[in-house]
Amino acid sequence: RGEVKDASGELEPPPGPFIQRGRASCWLGRTGSCQNCWLCSQGNCAGV
């Protein structure tokens, strides 16, 4: 679903369902909580 770079500029594969809101790109873990977040407000997946 397109390439998303993390804070280090490396391309990271999504470990779970991919959620994108505006410029925020987050991945959800199996538990439904945010497992890995990049470019998210305060490092959190608010609104997910």
Curated annotation (Swiss-Prot):
Disulfide bridges in this chain: 34-37, 40-45
Keywords for the protein's UniProt record, in alphabetical order: Disulfide bond
Domain of life: Eukaryota
Protein name from the UniProt record: Posterior pituitary peptide
Organism for this UniProt entry: Bos taurus
